[in-house]
Amino acid sequence: MLERIANIQKKLSKSIVERKINEVRKVAAVDVSYKEEKARAALVITTFPEGEVLKTKVIETTVSFPYIPTFFFLRETKPILIATKGETFDVLIVEGHGKAHPRGYGLASHIGVVLRKPTIGVAKRLLKNTPKDTYKKVGKVYVSVGNLITLEDATKIIRAILDESGYPKPLKLADKLSKGRIYEVKNTPSPNRSRKKRGNRGKDNNNSQGN
């Protein structure tokens, strides 16, 4: 069965389209966590590049397919599609690989093909036998094309929204929401904006620490 699915992945990889993306104003990120057969998917939609949270959404559903490396899309597609249904965004960041996959078709690519939306794959680790020309290391994550975006544009977008730990802020929020570590999101300035504001205060405030 898995061999047949692997062949389908190879065929579907040919449906991935790489192209320059137009103006990006809203970036969404989605992550899924599990407890037994329950999947909890969290979606976070933010402005770009400011990073202000516009909306959060958490859904729960059942899953029947087990976790099998390189076949992640069979397990996570359902909760992600439920979480993104009816939502609008310019780019979707998916916790999982896109073209950076042994068969060139990871979760982020499958979601992008199904939704017909620009998607970016982001993962903390590489899969074995991943072609080196399919990803870039940005901060602490590996970035790859999901669908309808170039690797150059995907890299620029992720670099612009990294937090101080080197992880994309919207995706980190989605991760925490999916795991129930937080239940609401409060807007905070991005690290770049915070540093700029501190620098401006230093010009007007004699008590500034000189940052």
From Swiss-Prot:
Task: Kindly report the protein's main subcellular placement as a broad class.
Answer: cytoplasm
Needed cofactors: Mg(2+)
- Transmembrane stretches in the record are none
Keywords attached to this entry: Cytoplasm, DNA damage, DNA repair, Endonuclease, Hydrolase, Magnesium, Metal-binding, Nuclease
GO CC term, one of those recorded: cytoplasm
What CDD domains would the database entry show? Endonuclease_V
The reply on keyword Magnesium is: yes
* GO molecular function ontology, one term from the record: magnesium ion binding
Where does the chain bind Mg(2+)? D31, E95
Q: Does the keyword Kinase apply?
A: no
Q: Where is this region: Disordered?
A: 182-211
Reactions catalysed according to its record = Endonucleolytic cleavage at apurinic or apyrimidinic sites to products with a 5'-phosphate
Q: Which InterPro entries match?
A: Endonuclease-V
Enzyme class, broadest EC rank: hydrolase
For this protein, the Enzyme Commission number is 3.1.21.7
Q: Which parts of the sequence are marked as the site Interaction with target DNA?
A: Y67
Its subcellular locations are:
Cytoplasm
As for family, the record states: Belongs to the endonuclease V family.
**According to its UniProt entry, what is the function of this protein?**
DNA repair enzyme involved in the repair of deaminated bases. Selectively cleaves double-stranded DNA at the second phosphodiester bond 3' to a deoxyinosine leaving behind the intact lesion on the nicked DNA.
Name of this chain's protein: Endonuclease V
User: Which lineage?
Assistant: Archaea, Methanobacteriati, Methanobacteriota, Thermococci, Thermococcales
